[in-house]
Amino acid sequence: MAIKYLKKSPKTSSTDDTKTREIVENILKDIEKKKEEGCKELGKKFDKYDGEIIVSKEKIEQIKKNLDQKTKDDVQFSHERVRKFAEAQLKNYGQDFEVELSDGLYAGQKLIPVNTAGCYVPAGRYAHIASAVMSVTTAKVAGVKNILVCSSPKPNVGAHPTIVYTADLCGADVIMNLGGVQAIAAMTNGLFGNAPADILVGPGNQFVAEAKRILFGKVGIDLFAGPTEIAIIADENADAEIVAIDLVGQAEHGYNSPAWLFTTSKDLADKVIKRVPELIAELPELPRTNAEAAWRDYGEVVLCDTDEEIASISDDYAPEHLEVQTKNLEWFHNRLKNYGSLFVGEETTVAYGDKCSGTNHILPTKGAGRYTGGLFVGKFIKTLSFQRMTKKSTELVGAAAARLSRYEGMEAHARTGDVRLKKYGFSN
């Protein structure tokens, strides 16, 4: 086997984690002490926003009235597809059931949505409108009754109007002008008159991700997210221009967004390495600055001898987004095991999934695709078991449970069976 790195990144997604953790821990302690006032102070400090936190119904109606129809149509287009996909997931997800395990002993499970979901919608460098669709729509379809949304406000404006419109359209019950760690803390602790969130979902920067990590346990979370990632598997049949722009398309997210190419074609690799900087140079300032740093520090081009080598290294990376642009699409589709979301063929691209094609864009990063998938209706639903039984069935179950408990040395456990056997007229 011969795997050769034509470009190797000098940094990893975990770079600077220690500093981030220290900053986030201090912010969380500050909010725990100062509560809502602490959130407001941090909103003023980081976002330069000094207005109301809760977006009023009047404000939402004003935004709905003022937002241009084309934007509303596009949001509705995305919402419809994400809703349909979530409904299909729900229909094919586990079912409530009850089964008789032995004479008189019944057991089953119920699928029960969480009561309150907190959805974080980033709006720092970019206004991530689609994140509102992905999180709120999926929670709504899952049956969550109370959906909170927090999004970073702009000075004298509040949350981005299209994000407010989108969150409201998709079913948010409360929208807050609050971003960053303070938003995560507010939803977790039930501040500003809201119920505490049972689960937090949505992407965010490293500080948001670290806040979710620290608070996990007190509140459920969708996943431990890091900077967004893309990997592309391509062979000599791939279009170098499309491969290059797809890598750049994800690199523009931020300075630490990995972009990886796995290929068996040296010719394709050389063309992509040459073309990526040219495409980056053509971008506006903010995405150009982000993409330049991301490609320089986190971009990789890996040359392999065989398709099997490519599949193996891809599964080792377990990328968040994985595109396959090869002649042998079905082989890769069946062979690949570790990724957040798979984009099969040149016709589709990460941006489609990110924005409006229907699959969810809240996905595992930093190799977490080895053990989990992305956000789906099941993240908002608890699978809870139950049992019931007749008095007659206690004769066998009670006696067996008592004996097993005594084997383990747990006498009080055993006596909970003994007392029932005695009450119902059975000997042990």
Language-model-derived ranges and their functions:
Residues D315-N428:
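C-terminal core of ALDH-fold dehydrogenases
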Residues M1-N115:
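N-terminal Rossmann-like NAD(P)+-binding subdomain of aldehyde/semialdehyde dehydrogenases
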Residues P203, L223-A234, Q250-I273, A291-V302, ...:
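Short loop-to-beta-strand entry elements in the cores of soluble alpha/beta enzymes
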Residues V99-Y165:
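Conserved small-residue-rich beta-alpha loop and adjacent elements
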Residues A2-K8, V174-G179, V301-T306:
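Short acidic-hydrophobic, aromatic-tinged amphipathic segments that line or gate anion-handling sites
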Residues N92-E98, G220, S257-F262, E282-A294, ...:
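Flexible, glycine/charged-enriched surface loops at secondary-structure junctions
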Residues L169-P258:
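Conserved NAD(P)+-binding/catalytic subdomain of aldehyde/semialdehyde dehydrogenases
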